[in-house]
């Protein structure tokens, strides 16, 4: 759940620290030549036709000839912005065709926040919540179908391989919905600090959609979300077992928002651990 008690209030500019640069250099040195050759990425701003209009989005894929599995990335409550473009580039460099949509296209063009945005400012926060409220369940399902169809229309997409979807904050719940909306296509779901919206008492709770899916799940929860609703992880595990869906549910030692660079609670160590788990998920299931 994204609220003033959980979500990081300060959105900071993302700059590469010396420590981060050193880590990236060390990782690059350990990669095989084939992985380094794939590090060049093609990036495009695209428009995706949906049932409700046209969504502005960012598309990424490896440079050169070839075809790769499709991945849909749902951003957090603050939408498509540089931090998620960075994420799209990184995924594409690992060998995927990646679409990062503006989830709020019905209300505003991305980016929907500026450099001065402060989540602690009630007026600014309520504006984002208003954008989210404009997204109905049916609308989200239709969007997910349109996004996967768009990915499959790209010549770089390996259509014979399964697709993945990952989401952050509110995007966790949207990823669950995507897996249910396109069950024959989505084989892997990653939810990162998805908050307490994954299990609710409502009839449209995302966890109730699990039996309609054919995916393997990775659910990485924030420690402060878990403190608010400690039973949720057990409810999720039970739902996965009942639906016979493979899943990993883990509470990370970091707060809500820890995976997204540029936020006050970004935790590099735990973010990299979550990314490694995501990489393993995709390598095993997008085949």
PLM regions and their residue ranges:
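Short beta-strand/loop motif that positions the catalytic acidic residue
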Residues: 213, 219-221
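Gly/Ser-rich "nucleophile elbow"/oxyanion-hole loop immediately N-terminal to the catalytic nucleophile
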Residues: 116-164
């Amino acid at each position: 759940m994204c609220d003033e008690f959980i979500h990081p209030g300060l959105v900071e500019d993302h700059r590469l620290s010396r420590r981060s640069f050193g880590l990236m250099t060390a990782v690059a040195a350990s990669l095989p030549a084939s992985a380094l050759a794939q590090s060049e990425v093609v990036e495009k701003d695209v428009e995706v036709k949906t049932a409700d209009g046209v969504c502005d989005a960012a598309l990424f894929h490896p440079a050169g000839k070839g075809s790769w599995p499709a991945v849909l990335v749902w951003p957090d409550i603050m939408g498509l912005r540089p931090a998620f473009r960075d994420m799209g580039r990184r995924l594409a460099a690992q060998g995927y065709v990646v679409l990062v949509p503006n989830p709020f296209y019905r209300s505003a063009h991305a980016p929907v926040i500026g450099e001065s945005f402060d989540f602690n400012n009630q007026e600014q926060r309520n504006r984002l919540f208003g954008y989210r409220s404009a997204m109905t369940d049916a609308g989200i399902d239709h969007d997910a179908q349109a996004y996967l169809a768009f990915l499959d229309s790209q010549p770089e997409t390996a259509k014979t391989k399964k697709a993945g979807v990952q989401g952050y904050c509110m995007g966790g719940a949207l990823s669950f919905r995507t897996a249910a909306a396109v069950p024959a296509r989505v084989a892997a779901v990653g939810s990162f600090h998805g908050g307490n919206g994954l299990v609710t008492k409502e009839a449209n709770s995302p966890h109730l959609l699990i039996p309609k899916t054919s995916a393997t799940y990775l659910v990485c929860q924030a420690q402060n979300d878990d403190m608010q609703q400690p039973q949720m992880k057990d409810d999720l595990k039970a739902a996965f077992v009942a639906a016979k869906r493979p899943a990993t549910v883990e509470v990370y030692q970091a707060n809500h928002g820890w995976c997204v660079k540029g936020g006050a609670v970004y935790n590099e160590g735990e973010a990299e651990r979550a990314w490694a788990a995501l990489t393993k998920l995709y390598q095993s299931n997008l085949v």
